[in-house]
A protein has these predicted regions:
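Short, flexible loop/hinge motifs at secondary-structure junctions
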Residues: 1-182, 224-225, 253-254, 260, ...
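Catalytic center-proximal scaffold of phosphoryl-transfer enzymes
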Residues: 1-3, 23, 125, 162-164, ...
Length: 530
């Protein structure tokens, strides 16, 4: 009904009808207000999505929180003052004036005994330019530069001498040693270089082929792949040993990353996305292992069938929000506070920059998590025992966790569940038990960053080759990533370790395979990082 018609009807109505008309108009207004609020919420949600995808494509990847200085008085003054006081403590006081600590000027570690080539620069003319008398040498200034010798190859020729008895004509020849790649010119150092370049430096095989061609050596990509595959066959017993050990560890970190295998198709005939799983022993475990494991898809069974805890003791697995980790028999899930924080950072990044209640709420959660991390950093700096860390966490961090989850329950009723902030709140609230679980044992970590970073190593390499041709190639790439990154986890020089491993593995019994692991007493000192 139009305004004019309503006015005419209202003017001609008696008192009872006027009240009914007004009541009807008020009900219509309420409905329109509800509709406007609903549309406004939808617009806010769509704007959040737009800002989220803009930030995803064009924004910075850092999760550092940029706080609006105009909002500091609301919730962040204490944190700011503490940060300033920390910075002030780092300023050195030297003889009446202050200066910031300088960064190290040493390009080379002092204990790195690099060879030094001395080049002396002397004057040819030793006559004084002022009086003409002969100059006397009184010392010298030094300029140092770090130089690199371009990679060189050489051929090592083994000669096995033959002997004959002049009396009885008996022929004798020196026995040949057992080598990993018989009847070929491919040495452990060459194959070790293939492996190191691909699985530590993420250098694709076709680029390795090009680099050898530049040195005048005709090594095809297919030959590189063939010999890396042969190395995998030799190394498999050690890989299986790592698998056995990591399944026995009482604390494990886990993560996963995508991998396309060309020969694996889905029902529509498209290349199926499979997953590489990454498992890492905890820092407290006596054998540091980084284990990559390929299996078809992201099904729960890929994780639940790998880990089987048949003992009575409690075991823990650090992981992100993927539900499969919750279903591993005999393992308790320890959720990741870095993931929880990331959800609030994402919510903050899609909000308008002007001060608002939502920004305040979001920053409060980020600051509370920041307080937890501040304590964790202090524990590491103090180098306290795991038992002491558990005690201090219960005293210092538990009250912060109580406040964090209490606020989540309060704010969950105030924000839209489908908004970024709503999703961040729900993410942490539904994982309260597993987010608190790190308080149970001082060996547990507040987050799963260690496994995440290792999964990213595989993802970085994947960008250079995108996919594997077949499942066997995916399995072997996981084997090599495991060998390389387990060496790194044990503070070994990965290339030197791989060469040493290939040199010795052909003469080692499978029953003694752990003697070649990075924690073995047989590891030479020269392949250990200083």
């Amino acid at each position: 009904m139009k305004k004019e018609e309503i006015l005419i009807k209202f003017n001609n109505a008696d008192e009872e009808e006027k009240r009914n008309i007004l009541l009807s108009l008020l009900l219509d207004l309420d409905k329109k207000d509800d509709k406007i609020n609903e549309q406004k919420s939808n617009i806010d949600h769509l704007n959040e999505l737009i800002n989220y995808y803009k930030n995803l494509i064009f924004g910075k990847k850092s999760e550092k929180n940029k706080v609006n200085p105009n909002q500091l008085s609301l919730f962040n003054e204490l944190e700011t003052e503490e940060t300033i006081s920390e910075l002030e403590q780092k300023i050195e006081e030297i003889k009446g004036y202050k200066r910031r600590p300088k960064g190290s000027k040493n390009l080379v570690n002092e204990d790195n005994n690099l060879p030094v080539e001395i080049i002396e620069h002397r004057r040819d003319d030793l006559s004084c330019p002022t009086c003409g008398n002969e100059l006397k040498e009184i010392g010298y200034d030094v300029r140092k530069e770090l130089c690199v010798i371009p990679e060189k190859c050489f051929i090592k020729e083994h000669r096995y001498f033959k002997y004959a008895c002049p009396t009885c004509s008996k022929m004798v020849q020196e026995e040949r040693e057992v080598i990993p790649f018989p009847n070929s010119m491919y040495s452990p150092s060459l194959v070790g270089k293939f492996i190191y370049d691909k699985f530590a430096l993420s250098l694709p095989f076709y680029r390795q082929e090009q680099s050898y061609r530049d040195l005048g050596i005709n090594i095809s990509r297919n030959n590189i792949i063939n010999y890396v595959s042969k190395a995998c066959d030799l190394i498999r017993p050690l890989y299986d040993k790592y698998s056995e050990i990591i399944k026995s560890a009482d604390i494990v970190h886990g993560d996963e990353t995508r991998l396309k295998v060309l020969s694996e198709k889905n029902e529509e005939g498209n290349v199926k996305t499979n997953y590489v799983w990454l498992f890492r022993t905890s820092q407290s475990f006596n054998k540091q292992i980084t284990f990559y494991y390929y299996n078809d898809g992201r099904k729960y069974s890929n994780v639940t069938s790998f880990f089987k805890n048949e003992t009575e003791e409690a075991r823990y697995i650090h992981a992100d929000g993927y539900e499969a980790y919750e279903h591993i028999k005999g393992y308790k899930l320890v959720s990741c506070f870095a993931h929880a924080r990331r959800k609030f950072v994402e919510a903050l990044n899609v909000m308008p920059s002007s001060p608002s209640k939502k920004r305040q709420i979001c920053n409060e959660y980020i600051n509370l998590i920041g307080k937890l991390y501040k304590f964790e950093k202090q524990y590491k700096e103090d180098k306290i025992s795991y038992e002491k860390r558990k005690e201090r966490r219960l005293i210092e961090e538990k009250p912060i966790l109580d406040e964090f989850f209490s606020n989540l329950k309060r704010d969950s009723l105030k924000v839209l569940p489908e908004s970024k902030l709503g999703k961040a709140i729900i993410y942490s609230l539904t994982r309260e038990e597993s987010l608190r679980r790190y308080l149970e044992d001082g060996r547990l970590e507040i987050d799963n960053n260690m496994a995440e970073h290792l999964a990213k190593n595989y993802a970085v390499g994947r960008k250079n080759w995108l996919f594997c041709d077949n499942p066997n190639g995916a399995v072997k790439s996981c084997m090599m990533y495991t060998i390389v990154h387990t060496a790194i986890a044990n503070n070994l020089k990965p290339e030197d370790y791989i060469i040493w491993l290939l040199d010795n593995i052909a003469t080692t019994n499978v029953s003694d395979i752990e003697s070649l692991a990075p924690w073995s007493s047989l590891i030479p000192d020269e392949i250990k990082r200083k």
